[in-house]
């Protein structure tokens, strides 16, 4: 994963007048993308434009998906109408979700590419003698078998020996002492999947392809993206964005209870052993039992390396394929993964979530709209915006979703609620919003006002770079090592352990933003490839003086060395809850432990006092003592420093603004609710309306 330039690099003050003009009257590219329907019906584009909508998300008709000439004609008519109305055109790359199946046509064409997962079947015994295992009735074939001596109840991987696979039976000879015979088989993955949950909603067959399979993914793009090019001709002026919706490895169980027989699925492709060997230097097959459990160091590292290999292969095969194809057509790629908020699912669904998202032109997320007082992970979009900044992507998108994380859907939310959720998401880096709230049930002037508010925020903040000087390590290695799959989603001791770790991490992230401390996530690769300069780490489009390490127990040695260099150069490292105990290979462990031995460790609840006062340098405007419900982030764009204030409360909030320059100054306050730009004297007091925001722009 490459990194972008430093904050503000390439920006010019000459661009700022364009920003001011866009704020006054936001062009369509900054306004809401409105979801269409899945029946192919003609959309009232002129009315939508009158309501201030900036674009449409079009879907090919579900009935007869991709095979109906009438559906193609309807889609073309909607595209022409949208272009005539001056709207953006985004197109969903599948019928509903999860993307990747082309409405089930991929598996129809290539049944061999349907998702098949690895399952384990084992038996234990003691002493010599014949031993065998039979293929489970639900599995198709064995792919590997091995017998291991047990030491303290654990398989000794380095002393295991292959067992003979003969058709549907594994045969072996028992070992001296206790042993475990393990067979690993492929099982078709259809029941209880996310894909099976959407059959009735979108009319597909529920048969999901293996996203690790190159043939499957070439077939997917051939049936979908390439079909649009064949039908519509040049796409550069026809479709702006292809949007992918929750493609994933599909190993999790989505029904109540557990998978029949308690069977546990692990993602698999025949190329994984070769890739694993090439990337990590040892054989995957002898350590296959570790993918299903084990807390010893060998098992944890095997899982770490396995899911990293899976993540690399998945990123190449799905999002990179789509993005590279789009470059040749002049169409950008976008999309939101499944359960973006959960570090557990960053592993379960993607191997390495950041690797997957990094390949998209426009990283995106699903944005819940819960009632006040309900759980709300408002900080979650920072995952996506951190990737965007690292990759130099200007646009970060979010779907305002009025259904998820709610007891009852709210398809016509009050405008203040829409402002509330867009403001908090913009605080965390989102600058393009889509939704399927029922726009036609609003007065056109009211909905136009919603679009203008959203458009003004996006007009100023798209292309801006976070000025955060606090980074939080993205501890994917530790989650990969700890993750053990389960027959029941989010159940079982191992899942609970990693989920609790993720919850503590979320609490820390929430506390940072609540106390006015913005931050950026840093993947280990970005730290490794960064440079240390005057007490700062310059990496992934940012410049950081503090790095928070949240329960990091696995730390690759090259990353550890860069962190040690950063610390020696005057940077601060805050270790939350634990110090690293492992490197990325056994011969790294001692060096990693010694490098940070004796460092202080803070509890999750003590991160804020341990940080103390943290503020990005170079800003002449400061806001102290934020009222409860008021949040702050700082950005840099086109040579301008921007202090962004969001009032999440129901009452007007006062913000005391001072100058760090030692004398008064004049700043411009951009009010996205009123649509005004007002010069103000600093120091002074500003009032932020409920569920609204202000952007204080230094001259």
Model region roles, listed by residue range:
Residues 1-2:
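N-terminal export leaders
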Residues 8, 12-15, 28-35, 42-43, ...:
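Carbohydrate-binding surfaces of carbohydrate-active enzymes
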Residues 18-26:
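N-terminal amphipathic alpha-helix/helix-capping segment at the start of soluble metabolic enzymes
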Residues 22, 44-45:
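Short secondary-structure capping/turn segments at boundaries of alpha-helices and beta-strands
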Residues 36, 49-50:
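N-terminal beta-rich core of secreted/periplasmic extracellular enzymes
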Residues 48-49, 55:
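An N-terminally biased module of ancient metal coordination in phosphate/nucleic-acid-related enzymes
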Residues 58-174, 178-218:
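Acidic/aromatic-lined carbohydrate-recognition and catalytic surfaces
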Residues 179-195, 202-230, 410, 469-482, ...:
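Catalytic grooves of carbohydrate-active enzymes
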């Amino acid at each position: 994963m490459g990194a972008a330039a430093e904050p503000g690099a390439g920006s010019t003050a000459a661009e700022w007048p364009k920003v001011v003009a866009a704020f006054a009257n936001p062009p369509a590219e900054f306004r809401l993308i409105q979801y269409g329907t899945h029946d192919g019906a003609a959309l009232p584009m002129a009315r939508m434009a009158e309501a201030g909508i900036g674009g449409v998300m079009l879907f090919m008709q579900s009935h007869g998906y991709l095979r109906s000439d009438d559906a193609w004609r309807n889609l073309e008519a909607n595209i022409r109408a949208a272009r005539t109305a001056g709207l953006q055109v985004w197109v969903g790359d599948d019928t509903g979700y999860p993307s990747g199946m082309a409405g089930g046509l991929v598996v129809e064409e290539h049944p061999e590419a349907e998702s098949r997962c690895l399952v384990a079947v084992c038996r234990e015994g003691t002493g010599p003698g014949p031993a065998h295992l039979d293929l489970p009735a639900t599995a198709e074939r064995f792919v590997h078998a091995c017998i291991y001596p047990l030491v303290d109840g654990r398989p000794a991987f380095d002393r295991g020996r292959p067992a003979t696979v003969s058709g549907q039976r594994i045969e072996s000879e028992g070992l001296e002492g206790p042993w475990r015979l393990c067979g690993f088989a492929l099982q078709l993955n259809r029941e209880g999947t996310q894909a099976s949950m959407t059959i009735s909603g979108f009319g597909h067959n529920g048969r999901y392809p293996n996203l690790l399979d190159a043939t499957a993914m070439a077939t997917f793009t051939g049936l979908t993206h390439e079909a649009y090019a064949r039908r519509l001709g040049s796409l550069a002026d026809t479709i702006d964005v292809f949007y992918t919706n929750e493609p994933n490895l599909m190993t999790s169980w989505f029904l109540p209870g557990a998978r029949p027989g308690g069977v546990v699925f692990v993602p698999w492709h025949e190329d994984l052993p070769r890739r694993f060997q090439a990337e990590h230097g040892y054989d995957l097959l002898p350590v296959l039992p570790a993918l299903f459990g084990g807390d010893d160091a060998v098992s944890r590292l095997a899982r770490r390396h396995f899911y990293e290999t899976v993540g690399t292969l998945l990123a190449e095969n799905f999002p990179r394929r789509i993005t590279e194809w789009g470059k040749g057509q002049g169409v950008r790629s976008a999309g939101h993964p499944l359960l973006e908020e959960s570090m557990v699912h960053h592993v379960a669904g993607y191997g390495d979530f950041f690797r997957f998202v990094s390949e998209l032109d426009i990283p995106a997320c699903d944005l819940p709209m819960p009632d006040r007082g309900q759980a709300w992970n408002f900080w979650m979009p920072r995952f996506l915006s951190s990737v965007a900044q690292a990759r130099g992507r200007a646009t970060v998108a979010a779907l305002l979703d009025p259904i998820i994380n709610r007891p009852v859907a709210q398809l016509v939310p009050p405008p203040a609620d829409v402002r509330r959720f867009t403001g908090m998401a913009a605080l965390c880096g989102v600058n393009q919003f889509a939704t399927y709230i029922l726009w036609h049930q609003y007065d056109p002037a009211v909905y136009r006002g919603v679009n203008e508010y959203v458009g003004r925020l996006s007009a100023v903040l798209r292309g801006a770079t976070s000025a955060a000087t606090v980074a939080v390590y993205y501890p994917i290695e530790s989650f990969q090592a700890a993750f053990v799959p389960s027959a029941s989603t989010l159940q079982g001791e191992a899942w609970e352990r990693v989920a609790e770790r993720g919850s503590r991490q979320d609490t820390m992230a929430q506390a940072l933003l609540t106390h006015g401390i913005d931050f950026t996530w840093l993947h280990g690769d970005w730290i490794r490839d960064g440079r240390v300069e005057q007490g700062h780490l310059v990496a992934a489009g940012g410049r950081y003086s503090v790095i928070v390490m949240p329960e990091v127990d696995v730390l690759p040695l090259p990353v550890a060395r860069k962190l040690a260099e950063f610390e020696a150069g005057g940077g601060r490292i805050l270790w939350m809850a634990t110090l690293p105990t492992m490197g990325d290979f056994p011969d790294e462990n001692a060096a990693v432990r010694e490098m940070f031995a004796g460092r202080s460790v803070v509890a999750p609840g003590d991160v804020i006092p341990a940080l103390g006062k943290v503020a990005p340098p170079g800003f002449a405007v400061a806001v102290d003592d934020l009222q409860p419900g008021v949040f702050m982030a700082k950005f840099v764009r086109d040579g301008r420093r921007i202090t962004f204030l969001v009032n999440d409360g129901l009452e007007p909030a006062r913000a005391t603004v001072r100058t760090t320059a030692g004398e008064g100054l004049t700043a411009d306050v951009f009010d996205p609710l009123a649509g005004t730009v007002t010069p103000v004297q600093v120091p002074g007091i500003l009032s932020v309306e409920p569920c609204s925001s202000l952007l204080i722009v230094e001259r």
